Amino acid sequence: VGSEMCIRDRDGRNYIVYGNDEIWITELNEDLTAPKKDGLHRLLVSDHKNPELGYEGSHIQKINGYYYIFLVHSLRDRWMRTEACFYSDSLEGEFTGGDVLCDDRGYCGQGVAQGGIVDTPDGKWYAMLFQDSGAVGRIPILLPVTWKDHFPVFGQNGHVPEEIEVHSTRPGYIYQPLVGSDDFCNGLLPRWQFNHDPDPRYYHLDASQGTYTITTREVCTELTQAVNTLTQRMSYPSCAAEVTVDASALKEGDVAGLCALQSCYAAVGITKHHGKYEVLMLDKKEDGILDMTERTVVESHQMDFRLEADFCNMKDEARCYYRVNKGDWLPIGTVHKLYFKLDHFTGCRFGLFCYAAEETGGSACFRDFKYYDVDEIS
């Protein structure tokens, strides 16, 4: 258990560093498929019987003749993720060191930790770590690193600074945002990711019409089984999304709409029930129970859906809305509690979905996806 990292030394020998509580190093064979016979195998450091979290998340780097191992663990007296570093001038020698950063940035006791360090062309060093932030997931944290007696010093006065200045190697270059709106007129933008392996036979992107269409491939028992669900990561501290759905080609029992995707998901959608269209909220509880709340018959097969999420200080709540014919937004269902759990082990995401509950071959057409960050939510 725990993550691992490989390193190839300058003499061509290969090693893997791994473990949880106890961190081990094992020499590998030339093709990295097995331990090397009679190769190096030893315990490097131990945080044995830590009641919260022992050392894990190994990153090993060789810098200026020294080997550095960066690890995460928790303080023993309470849950507080903490970054540790140990170093040695030999893989067979003693590794010394300890904690190098214990700071939650004033946020809910969630320590910044786990990662490694990188240098820039101008000789500056930075650590790339992350902070658990509740249902929105893990947020990357960049902080400066300096050196004292060959040992890294993280942050400023033991803390993550609120702001740092970095020099770009591509001045003037315009970076595309990681999330944002899409009219589907320019192909699938890099900001989108499929929930799991997509099946191109069952989705269609029509750039001329600005539509993304999902056709159901198989009968599903719930949303997380749906194929070709298209997702974007949600943003801290709050965000919202809207999309227009044409449900005219749904088959009986199909459900299509907009979701806050995780194992305990919330979704607002449209279904076909006894030949009539109904809007509904899907409410997947922490205990695994799925509720379909507040089903409302509507006359139109085209609907706008909106989902708002509030992650501030780990509030972790989602709210669903719908509207007909561009009228007022109407709330549907209850305020939904979101979670960051090990079963999905990822931050919450907006998702466009369509799945079949009774028979396959139905489809839903999505257009005009709009993404709002905290400054744009009214």
PLM regions and their residue ranges:
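Blade-edge beta-strand/turn elements of extracellular beta-propeller
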Residues: 1, 27-53, 86-107, 150, ...
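Conserved beta-propeller blade signature
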Residues: 14-18, 68-70, 125-128
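Extracellular glycan-recognition regions
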Residues: 143, 150-378
